[in-house]
Structures are given as structure tokens and as C-alpha cells.
Regions:
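Catalytic binding pocket for nucleotide-activated donors in carbohydrate/polymer assembly enzymes
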Residues: 274-354
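Donor nucleotide-activated moiety binding/catalytic core segment of transferases
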Residues: 239-297
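Conserved catalytic-core segment of nucleotide-activated headgroup transferases in glycan assembly
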Residues: 20-23, 158-255
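Short internal beta-strands
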Residues: 39-45, 134, 229-238
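Nucleotide-activated donor-dependent transferases that construct or modify glycoconjugates
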Residues: 1-17, 195-202
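Extended catalytic core of nucleotide-activated donor transferases of GT-like folds
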Residues: 6-10, 25-131, 138-143, 263-268
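A short, active-site helix/loop in glycosyltransferases that binds the activated sugar's phosphate group
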Residues: 111-180
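A charged, aromatic-enriched C-terminal amphipathic alpha-helix characteristic of glycosyltransferases
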Residues: 335-381
């Protein structure tokens, strides 16, 4: 079996722009290990002839080819990080090839937000694929997707590995003499460690914004000023003059005490290595995120509302701000002392996400074999 996965290339690209760009290579690496997969190609949906420099060596061994040039080179096309031309997909399917749309974003938000908020969004003809694959977090949207795309929808495992993070950490150490990862301090030096809390939500969708984390950090500061040294709000420069955001930010005690920094977008490892000690997050119906995994791998206290993470990090339910504040204060008091057990718990969780984990390889093998065993899904009722 020969498989093509879509990627989007553009000038000035780097792998830290979003998690999706990394996920392509996690999937490609997994598929290449399957015994019945002969080759994995990258379908170039952009305007560059090469992958970003920071993708190497993860991109090594994967040919980057324009989709139209792979018609006779692949048996399965996976639309993932770049939109594929529907006429070409029709041609593929007419030849008996299979097409999968791997939906990694939150599908309801992607459908609704562009219309309501006047945002640009990618759109293509719905009836273009044989199956849709989603991450387990989006299982509740399967009926919606089946209705829209007129094809079956299935879960596939979330994949992650630390290769990109480790490479970035190596560059930071070599070029800037800074170390990635949380650095515990001897307990005798403090009762509550004054944490530099970082909020790294992208603020481009209602599913992941900084509002709840801001309130959690401020509630923690009001309850115990010794627990919070600073609040760093990344991806907020574009909102700093919006009246609603200004009103929210100015209401915080942290702002009144000049302890808030409003920042543009930065890569996780580069920023946390220099300016952060803890990560405070919030999500709505999108609890599988690369940010969480990067934070756990670095040993940083992760205050989150993701049930998916289980016992990893510091969990608070839903949008429970008092609970989140208590977990942040708990991290301030106990994280250094419990650092080793925190790292062990995180490592156990992260290991299960590896593209080389047998359970993940088995799940994707079954998905591909199911996909290619059905002659014509469109005829089914």
C-alpha cells in the first residue's frame, strides 16, 4: 500500500506554527512502520518546493510531491494539513483509490465560527472522501460529520512524540545558553514558590482562549499573592486594544499590580525556557492538545481542564475558576517537592501516544485495512 498525506507549505514556514504541522509527521512515521505500507508520500499543497528546515530529520525519507503528480503513485490519499483539489480526488476515486479526510480541528467550530464571526475558513465540497478520521475528543460530532460528508466517520488515536521539542531544546542550549524544562528549587528556600504563569492559548477560536486562565491566575493571586510572580499572556497582541479584552484585563488585580505581560506568538520551548514556570490552560470540547503534552514533557505544572490527561498535570473541572486557582496554588506549594512523581506520571501518559507504540500501530493498521476492503461506500445504506 502506498499512502499520500497532504501538507501545506509556504514561505517563512516553521513547524511551531501549529500542532497540525507536527501531527503530519507523527502519522507519516507511524504509517511507514506498518508491514503492508510500501511508501508514504507528502502531498504538497503549498507553494514551496521543500519542507521547513526545522522539520529535518523528521521529513527525511518522505518525498514531497504535488498531488497531481502522485495519481499513479498512491493507493490512499489522506487530506490532513492541506486541502486537496476535489477534481483530483474524483479522479483518484474513479481509479479505485481511497480518500480519507483526517479532521484534526474541532469540526463544529470550523463549521460555525467563520460564518458567525466573519472569519476566513477553508471550505471544499463535502462529498469528496470515503471515510473521515477524527481524534477521540470529537466523537460527539460524528453524526454531524456523517450527515455533512455522506460517509462513515471513525476515531483514530492521537499521536505525539518529543522529537521536535527536543530538537528545539538543543538549539536553545547551543545558540542561547538557555535550558528547556522546569527547574525545581530546594524546598527550604520558600513555602509558596512565586510562579511565572504562562497562558499560551491561540485566541483564534472560542474553543481555546485566555479568558478563563486569566481569571484562574487572578483568583490564585488574590487568595495568595506569594503564589504568582507574573502572568504572561501570549497571543494577545492582536486583542490588546479591543474594548472587551481591555475591560477584562484591567479588572485583574494582577494588572493593577503591573504583573501582566501581553505578548505575541512564541514557540513553547523558546518562551518557557526564559520566562515561564507554569502553564494555565482552558479548552471547550477540545481536550487533546499538543500544548499540554509539551508542558508535561518539560515538567512544567500544567493547570488544565482536560479529562483526557487523567492524573497527569493539575486538573480542574469544566470552567471552575476557584478549583483552577486552588490547583495553581497547590502547584506553587508542592510541585518542586513532588517533581519526580509528576515527571513519572507524565512520562507514562506520553509514552502511550508514541507513533511507535504497538496499540497505535494496530489501530491505524485496522483503519487502513477497513478502508481498503470496502469497494464502494457510496452504495451502502
Amino acid at each position: 500500500m502506498r499512502i499520500g498525506i497532504s501538507v501545506f507549505t509556504h514561505a517563512g514556514q516553521n513547524v511551531w506554527e501549529n500542532g497540525l504541522g507536527q501531527n503530519v509527521f507523527y502519522l507519516a512515521r507511524l504509517l511507514r512502520t506498518l508491514p503492508f505500507v510500501e511508501e508514504v508520500l507528502l502531498l504538497n499543497c503549498g507553494d514551496q518546493s521543500h519542507l521547513p528546515d526545522d522539520v529535518e530529520p523528521d521529513g527525511a525519507g518522505f518525498r514531497l510531491i504535488a498531488p497531481q503528480d502522485t495519481t499513479d503513485l498512491i493507493d490512499v490519499a489522506i487530506e490532513m494539513a492541506g486541502g486537496l483539489d476535489v477534481n483530483w480526488l474524483d479522479q483518484l476515486r474513479s481509479k479505485g483509490k481511497k480518500v480519507v479526510y483526517h479532521c484534526c480541528g474541532q469540526p463544529y467550530a470550523a463549521l460555525i465560527e467563520p460564518t458567525i464571526f466573519g472569519k476566513e475558513g477553508y471550505s471544499s465540497r463535502f462529498e469528496r472522501c470515503d471515510e473521515i478520521w477524527t481524534l477521540p475528543r470529537d466523537r460527539c460530532f460524528h453524526p454531524m460529520l456523517e450527515s455533512l460528508y455522506r460517509c462513515p466517520v471513525y476515531d483514530v488515536p492521537y499521536l505525539w512524540e518529543p522529537a521536535f521539542l527536543e530538537r528545539r531544546a538543543t538549539l536553545l542550549r547551543r545558540d542561547h545558553a538557555v535550558e528547556f524544562g522546569y527547574r525545581p528549587q530546594p524546598r527550604k528556600e520558600y513555602t509558596f514558590r512565586a510562579l511565572r504563569a504562562a497562558v499560551l492559548e491561540p485566541n483564534i477560536s472560542v474553543t481555546k482562549t485566555c479568558s478563563i486562565p486569566m481569571l484562574i491566575c487572578d483568583a490564585a493571586f488574590r487568595a495568595n499573592e506569594d503564589a504568582i510572580a507574573e502572568l504572561h499572556l501570549l497571543n494577545t497582541i492582536q486583542m490588546k486594544d479591543h474594548p472587551t479584552f481591555v475591560h477584562l484585563a484591567n479588572s485583574l488585580d494582577l494588572t493593577k499590580r503591573r504583573k501582566v505581560r501581553f505578548e505575541q506568538r512564541h514557540d513553547f520551548a523558546g518562551y518557557m525556557s526564559q520566562f515561564g514556570d507554569a502553564v494555565v490552560t482552558h479548552q471547550w470540547q477540545q481536550d487533546q492538545n499538543t500544548l499540554y503534552l509539551d508542558a508535561l514533557y518539560g515538567g512544567y505544572p500544567l493547570i488544565h481542564n482536560s479529562k483526557w490527561l487523567g492524573s497527569a498535570g493539575y486538573y480542574y473541572p469544566d470552567a471552575d475558576i476557584p478549583s483552577g486557582a486552588c490547583r495553581l496554588i497547590e502547584a506553587s506549594r508542592n510541585h518542586d517537592e513532588n517533581f519526580d512523581s509528576y515527571r513519572r506520571s507524565a512520562s507514562e501518559f506520553l509514552a502511550a501516544l508514541s507513533p511507535l507504540h504497538t496499540m497505535n500501530q494496530t489501530a491505524y493498521s485496522r483503519s487502513l485495512l477497513r478502508l481498503t476492503s470496502v469497494r464502494d461506500r457510496r452504495a451502502a445504506c
